[in-house]
């Protein structure tokens, strides 16, 4: 695969200047809620039943130790921001059980109608929402932000006119288009 330029130069710069590492997630391609659960709680899904989604089971009924609860004990206000619908994976009712004080979903975002070619709300709306969270409190804030713009499936047809980053060398032109869409 040949990519015309590094698609993540800012991340590479940050990786060189600060501590960094690899992050292993429990699912790829679906199951975002399980990755969120592990990130927010530090608990592995290996302690749950096969195919279980804590968001769809235990978290509907009870709270759970989590980063938001720990940080709230240190004086932080905990916010969750997600540019998708609040009821998807039951986040509207789950996030309070994970210790979040506020939850802003796509329905409450001013630019919610700004979509990418696949229909996902663009990530640029998240910046304004994060700033609103920061401005809403006097003290320190923990803001957990979930993006949807990069969700696949990635298009096999060319959707970007004059892409900044070009990709060649995949097994097919359709795969080149998918990689190019992802990189841009």
Language-model segments: which ranges?
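Solvent-exposed soluble domains appended to multi-pass membrane proteins
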Residues: 1-184
């Amino acid at each position: 695969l040949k990519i015309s330029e590094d698609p993540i130069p800012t991340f590479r710069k940050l990786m060189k200047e600060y501590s960094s590492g690899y992050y292993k997630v429990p699912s790829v391609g679906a199951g975002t809620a399980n990755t969120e659960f592990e990130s927010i709680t530090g608990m592995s899904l290996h302690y749950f039943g096969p195919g279980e989604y804590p968001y769809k089971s235990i978290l509907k009924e009870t709270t759970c130790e989590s980063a938001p609860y720990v940080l709230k004990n240190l004086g932080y206000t905990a916010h969750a921001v997600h540019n998708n619908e609040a009821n998807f994976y039951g986040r509207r009712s789950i996030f309070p059980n994970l210790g979040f004080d506020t939850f802003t979903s796509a329905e409450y975002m001013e630019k919610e109608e700004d979509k990418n070619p696949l229909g996902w709300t663009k990530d640029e709306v998240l910046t304004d929402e994060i700033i609103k969270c920061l401005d809403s409190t006097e003290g320190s804030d923990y803001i957990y932000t979930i993006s949807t713009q990069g969700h696949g499936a990635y298009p096999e047809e060319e959707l970007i006119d004059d892409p900044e980053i070009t990709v060649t060398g995949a097994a097919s032109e359709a795969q080149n288009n998918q990689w190019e869409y992802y990189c841009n």
